[in-house]
């Protein structure tokens, strides 16, 4: 009886592309509400980080909330939109 060794082909997986979830400023939503929604929507979002994102969007017009896989970016952006915040997502180049 002979023993034959099969070679396993090396498969290199490409890393999944990442997407930025963006929060756009609006002048009507209370700042505390934006902070609250960010903390409820994004896992492990700390109040200080949520406040920083809110202020960046308020002062600069837009802020990056999180960079993640497409499926998560879609979910987070849609969740922010459901809470009457303006959010989009785009590839992270």
UniProtKB/Swiss-Prot annotation:
Pfam families: ClpS. GO terms for biological process: protein catabolic process; proteolysis. It comes from the Bacteria. InterPro entries: ClpS, ClpS_core, Ribosomal_bL12_C/ClpS-like. Belongs to the ClpS family. Binds to the N-terminal domain of the chaperone ClpA. PANTHER family: ATP-DEPENDENT CLP PROTEASE ADAPTER PROTEIN CLPS (PTHR33473:SF19), ATP-DEPENDENT CLP PROTEASE ADAPTER PROTEIN CLPS1, CHLOROPLASTIC (PTHR33473). This is ATP-dependent Clp protease adapter protein ClpS. It comes from Gloeobacter violaceus (strain ATCC 29082 / PCC 7421). The lineage of its organism: Bacteria, Bacillati, Cyanobacteriota, Cyanophyceae, Gloeobacterales. The gene is clpS.
